[in-house]
Regions:
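N-terminal active-site segment of His-dependent metallophosphoesterases
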Residues: 2-78, 82, 383, 387
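Accessory, non-catalytic peripheral segments of nucleic-acid enzymes
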Residues: 5, 9, 47, 52, ...
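Active-site neighborhood of phospho(di)ester-bond hydrolases with catalytic His/Asp-centered motifs
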Residues: 16-17, 53-58, 86-93, 113-118, ...
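Divalent metal-coordination and catalytic microenvironments
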Residues: 18, 38, 58, 73, ...
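Metal-dependent catalytic neighborhoods of phosphoester/phosphodiester hydrolases
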Residues: 24-26, 59-76, 91-111, 116, ...
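Active-site neighborhood of divalent metal-dependent phosphoester/pyrophosphate hydrolases
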Residues: 50-68, 85-98, 191-209
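Conserved catalytic scaffold of divalent metal-dependent phosphoesterases
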Residues: 102-208, 276
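Conserved beta-sheet core of the metallophosphoesterase superfamily
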Residues: 194-195, 199-268
Length: 395
């Protein structure tokens, strides 16, 4: 006998990503802030009776994380497991897939599912409720040149680039779900989907100058839980980035951080609610003359914030950082741009903001040789960056 929808609880998922455990903000220690977020995440999972927590990559900030970051992750996974939720976690471009995936077979038996190997991306975590099965597929970050030989086989040759490998992955997932007869399907992936807005804190993943993939690759899934971009955002109603739980650059000062609470009914249709993350310490970007910043009551509201300051005095004031720190104890960045400065006189950080590695390297070649790099030189630079990414992906 069928159960009326009104009486049947939906499958509830909690989508988070980009914890970047072990990361600092301009050398400011963020361990307490990251710990506070994980406490919040556990509280949400318990209070909302979450069935599964989806962690869409970049658990750690680097391939070999510090010991305290590993301990923080272990504690968080243990406490999330104690809420009764299953956990599905994929590796991101900052993670070492092999290290993060250690012990995955044992952890699977405890309900913690690590999807870090490309070969396993079409092997779902199957959740059951009164509506029947729901398949969660975890696609780890796929570095195109490094994983082509590790992907599940398909009928066609895999094109080069991110679109090629992710398109192949999506095709393998659809084929597996059809073979299993499972209609409700959720996909987790780590990458840059077209329409998503980047910040200054994501690592460039472009290959041959192309880092984005079309959203159409993931058409037809009940929900797509994305990681990589640090701003919480919606690509399509059923396709979202949770974003990082903390701001990891001052370009994120205006971001509202959080997670997504996702309910899936019997048809796989998502009902989605934003869950705001706690604000450990605000980020503020200030600009003005030193005397105004130190003396004006208008700046009093920023005294407990992490602060980035750009001074516009006609000449560089002496002892500016010490003076600023007396009023703003958590000032982290000090830049100097006198009023009327020409664009090419900006600092290095301002000139490179939002640019990919290849264009920055090409500008360096122009600077030292006084000539635009040739096509062969650009190809050499692109190959060098690809080799580094492949080495990082191998762990």
């Amino acid at each position: 006998m069928s159960v009326p929808w009104a009486r049947v609880r939906a499958m509830r998922l909690l989508h988070t990503s980009d914890w970047h455990l072990g990361r600092s903000l301009h050398r400011a220690d963020l361990r307490a802030a990251q710990s506070a977020f994980l406490d919040h995440l556990v509280d949400v999972a318990r209070a909302e009776k979450v069935d599964a927590v989806l962690v869409a990559g970049d658990v750690y900030d680097r391939a070999v994380p510090p010991v305290d970051a590993v301990e923080l992750c272990e504690d968080a996974l243990l406490r999330l497991h104690d809420t009764g939720a299953r956990i599905v976690l994929i590796s991101g471009n900052h993670d070492s897939a092999r290290r993060l995936g250690f012990g995955s077979g044992l952890l699977e038996k405890a309900g913690v599912h690590l999807r870090t190997r490309p070969a396993a991306l079409a092997r779902p975590v199957v959740l059951e409720d009164a509506h029947g099965p729901l398949a969660v597929y975890g696609v780890p970050y796929l570095e195109p040149d490094a994983v082509r030989g590790e992907l599940p086989p398909g009928q066609d040759e895999i094109p080069r680039g991110h679109t090629g490998v992710l398109g192949h992955a999506a095709g393998c997932i659809r084929a597996d779900a059809e073979a299993r007869g499972i209609r409700r399907r959720v996909v987790m992936a780590h990458g840059w989907v077209s329409g998503g807005a980047a910040s200054e804190s994501e690592r460039d993943i472009s290959v041959g100058g192309v880092g984005q993939v079309p959203a159409e690759l993931f058409a037809g899934f009940g929900y797509v839980a994305l990681g990589h971009l640090h701003g919480q955002q919606t690509i399509a109603p059923q396709m979202r980035y949770s974003g990082s739980p903390l701001p990891y650059s001052f370009s994120e000062a205006s971001h509202r951080k959080g997670s997504w609470l996702v309910d899936l009914d019997g048809e796989g249709t998502a009902r989605i609610e934003q869950v705001p993350a706690p604000v450990y310490r605000r980020l503020s970007v200030l600009r003005g003359r030193l005397a105004d910043l130190l003396g004006s009551a208008a700046y009093g509201q920023y005294e407990d914030d992490f602060v980035s300051v750009t001074l516009t005095d006609p000449s560089r004031p002496e002892g500016a950082m010490d003076a600023l720190r007396a009023r703003f104890p958590h000032v982290l960045v000090l830049a100097f741009e006198p009023e009327g400065v020409l664009p090419d006189q900006r600092g290095y950080r301002a000139r490179t903001a939002g640019r990919d590695d290849l264009s920055i390297a090409a500008e360096f070649v122009r600077h030292v040789s006084n000539a635009t790099p040739t096509a062969a030189e650009k190809q050499l630079l692109a190959s060098a960056f690809a080799a580094v990414r492949t080495e990082e992906a191998a762990g």
